[in-house]
């Protein structure tokens, strides 16, 4: 499976050039493929906030490279560069508050600085750590894909109809995807009849990004409006809903793109299995439950403007980016460390105590 997945890898969204970071501008896809160049931590923070780059793993990787750029700038300026670097950490941390991979990556970079040996070049050490974070995410994608395919096959070995939400592919990670990586692997193994893709309003990550990735891979796919999910489950024989995650708490609650919670409720009602796929860096054991997660909200203009024209300008807007799916609605959480079925606090603790695969 590993070799087949690597051979099928086509899309990259993050490229490190040593002195700058290039990000495939996801606001312009699929009509334009434009690379956005960042030469400072502030530029990367803006790119994260403005959705040039999105997806929890990709955000974390980008932030790691941003600290390399920041360290070089701070050291060149002289003075207490470590203290000054904390300003860059804070700037990056504030760019997307829900994605725990962002904070995980920043902590990994901080810890690397704390382990510096006498005479060791801090910038070189940080660069090596950022590259390691990037490469580790790719390896995690491979492991999750295999675990996810094994889970699908164990429940039903014939080609199946799957439903996914938002974008969890190569555009959202350092490899070829979390949930979409499992779907890609399932397709290579002959387990996919068709993938139904939620459009995912208001940024349309499903219709702009996931559909683009699936079509590029030759995976049979159908785009649907978000509100068709219940009808699809009832009429199209959906066997799995497969989604990613931006944060998973110690009890197995999952914060993900808005609309995920309602998919889980609908899946439970229709007897459809619900799988969450995310690296262990997405799991925040410091939070007991999803009630403690800070859920980002974005500007109301995202709902009030169509083709540059503003409608119902005076109405109040509620535009949350994420919601929380309770653990008791989830059949399985798939990570690079293994699979937790019917997650709870004890099972999540056992998972996180396992040795890392990379």
Curated annotation (Swiss-Prot):
SUPFAM superfamilies: NagB/RpiA/CoA transferase-like. Keywords: Amino-acid biosynthesis, Isomerase, Methionine biosynthesis. Pathway: Amino-acid biosynthesis; L-methionine biosynthesis via salvage pathway; L-methionine from S-methyl-5-thio-alpha-D-ribose 1-phosphate: step 1/6. It comes from the Bacteria. One of its GO terms (biological process) is L-methionine salvage from methylthioadenosine. It is an enzyme of class 5 (isomerase). The record marks 166 as: Transition state stabilizer. Its EC number is 5.3.1.23. One of its GO terms (molecular function) is S-methyl-5-thioribose-1-phosphate isomerase activity. The active site is at residue 246. It catalyses: 5-(methylsulfanyl)-alpha-D-ribose 1-phosphate = 5-(methylsulfanyl)-D-ribulose 1-phosphate. Substrate binds at residues 54-56, 96, 205, 256-257. Belongs to the eIF-2B alpha/beta/delta subunits family. MtnA subfamily. NCBIfam families: eIF-2B_rel, PRK05720.1, salvage_mtnA. PANTHER family: METHYLTHIORIBOSE-1-PHOSPHATE ISOMERASE. Catalyzes the interconversion of methylthioribose-1-phosphate (MTR-1-P) into methylthioribulose-1-phosphate (MTRu-1-P). This is Methylthioribose-1-phosphate isomerase. It comes from Stutzerimonas stutzeri (strain A1501) (Pseudomonas stutzeri). The gene is mtnA.
